[in-house]
């Protein structure tokens, strides 16, 4: 079997885009991805960042589902500390029923302190980096309690939970006369009657999210941050999975990366350097990565000082940019160095004004790159 492909839509829209433009670009991206055989689309949830400005991914998922046939969708991720688990469990269950098997669930603790602050959580560090203290630990505790409540609600069995962070329950269904349906409770359990597949993202070297994924047999999604971190993610995930009695399977591992294909290497590099991807990295991602030490892994792989890691360095040495043959070679080299993965999750960017280069890239990745990448052994 060959590697699967997916999109991850943060959405990295440049400041000044309207909410309607962002929404429309998400729908167009989903339709194009579905038409060229992309397997999945993850849509981020953020409440504070101007470049990552989708607070309700479920709205985009519901709208895109009506215009697509095969592609699966996931919020990536619902930030569990920011929402009441009973409300979230009900919404997730209903949306998964609407999508009839094309839904999986991404969960997270929240990457940005500003968003946590908006939800009443002060002094939280970057949950996907090494910063943060007790409040960051509390975010991870909140994730676990929220999951406990949601899974209880999906079972539709009576309970009441008085927790550290939330109180929630599920009422007992009242008995009525035969044929009397006025006392029955609506069924908002997920499609198929059991919890949906759950995925979590990890970035930092010793990612607590990867440990949680292994413990709970969730799908691990690594944000590529260098060879050492990617290898460590699989080690942490595998160790936790085996300790919990699960069998780790690399085909379930997804890796999120910056990928762009064109007919030639020269054209691909030019389109990235001069286009929306380059603009986003120069204005937003490179400054953030430097601020939080997230450039260190890339620099270490190349043996340079992180301060010397600029856009051209990333395009030439980190991103998967080039012709289909070149991108295939780069992925195979990463497989050789890290052990491989099952899904390449392509980072989406703001090609709203001129979609053609991006749509061509997605088609080349799906049809000319992915089929040549064989799934790794477990």
Swiss-Prot record:
Gene3D superfamilies: Luciferase-like domain. GO terms for molecular function: monooxygenase activity; oxidoreductase activity, acting on paired donors, with incorporation or reduction of molecular oxygen. Induction: By (-)-camphor and, to a lesser extent, by (+)-camphor. Optimum pH is 7.0. InterPro entries: Bact_Lucif_Oxidored (IPR050766), Luciferase-like_dom (IPR011251), Luciferase-like_sf (IPR036661). FMN binds at residues 10, 44, 76, 201-209. Keywords: Flavoprotein, FMN, Monooxygenase, Oxidoreductase, Plasmid. It catalyses: (1S,4S)-bornane-2,5-dione + FMNH2 + O2 = (1S,4S)-5-oxo-1,2-campholide + FMN + H2O + H(+). SUPFAM superfamilies: Bacterial luciferase-like. It holds the Pfam family Bac_luciferase. It comes from the Bacteria. GO terms for cellular component: cytosol. Homodimer. Likely forms a loose transient complex with a P.putida flavin reductase that provides the required FMNH(2) to the enzyme. Belongs to the bacterial luciferase oxidoreductase family. Involved in the degradation and assimilation of (-)-camphor, which allows P.putida strain NCIMB 10007 to grow on this enantiomer of camphor as the sole carbon source. Catalyzes the FMNH(2)-dependent lactonization of 3,6-diketocamphane via a Baeyer-Villiger oxidation to produce the unstable lactone 5-oxo-1,2-campholide with (S,S) configuration, that presumably undergoes spontaneous hydrolysis to form 2-oxo-Delta(3)-4,5,5-trimethylcyclopentenylacetate. Is also able to convert (-)-camphor to the corresponding lactone in vitro. This is 3,6-diketocamphane 1,6-monooxygenase. It comes from Pseudomonas putida (Arthrobacter siderocapsulatus). The gene is camE36.
């Amino acid at each position: 079997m060959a590697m699967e492909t997916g999109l991850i839509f943060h959405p990295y829209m440049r400041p000044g885009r309207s909410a309607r433009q962002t929404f429309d670009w998400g729908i167009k991206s989903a339709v194009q991805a579905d038409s060229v055989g992309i397997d999945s689309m993850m849509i981020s949830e953020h409440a504070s960042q101007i470049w990552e400005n989708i607070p309700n991914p479920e709205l985009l998922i519901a709208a895109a589902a009506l215009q697509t046939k095969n592609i699966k969708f996931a919020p990536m991720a619902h930030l569990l500390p920011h929402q009441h688990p009973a409300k979230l469990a009900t919404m997730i269950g209903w949306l998964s029923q609407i999508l009839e098997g094309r839904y999986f669930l991404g969960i997270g603790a929240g990457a940005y302190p500003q968003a946590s602050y908006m939800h009443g959580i002060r002094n939280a560090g970057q949950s996907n980096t090494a910063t943060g203290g007790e409040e960051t630990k509390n975010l991870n505790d909140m994730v676990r309690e929220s999951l406990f409540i949601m899974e209880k609600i999906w079972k539709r069995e009576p309970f009441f939970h008085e927790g550290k962070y939330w109180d929630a329950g599920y009422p007992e269904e009242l008995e009525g006369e035969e044929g009397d349906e006025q006392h029955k409770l609506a069924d908002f359990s997920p499609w198929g009657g059991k919890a949906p597949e759950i995925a979590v993202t990890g970035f930092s070297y010793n990612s607590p999210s990867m440990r949680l994924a292994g413990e709970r047999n969730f799908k691990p999604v690594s944000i590529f941050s260098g060879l050492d971190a990617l290898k460590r993610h699989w080690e942490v995930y595998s160790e936790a999975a085996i300790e919990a009695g699960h069998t780790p399977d690399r085909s379930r591992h997804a890796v999120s990366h910056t990928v762009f294909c064109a007919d030639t290497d020269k054209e691909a590099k030019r389109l990235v350097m001069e286009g929306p991807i380059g603009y986003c990295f120069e204005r937003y991602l490179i400054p953030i990565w430097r601020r939080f030490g997230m450039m260190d892994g890339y620099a270490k792989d190349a043996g340079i000082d992180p301060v010397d890691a600029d856009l051209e360095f990333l395009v030439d040495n980190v991103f998967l940019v080039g012709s289909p043959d070149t991108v295939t070679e780069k992925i195979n080299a990463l497989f050789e160095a890290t052990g491989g993965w099952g899904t390449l999750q392509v980072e989406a960017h703001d090609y709203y004004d001129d979609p053609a280069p991006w749509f061509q890239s997605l088609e080349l990745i799906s049809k000319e790159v992915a089929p040549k990448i064989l799934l790794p052994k477990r």
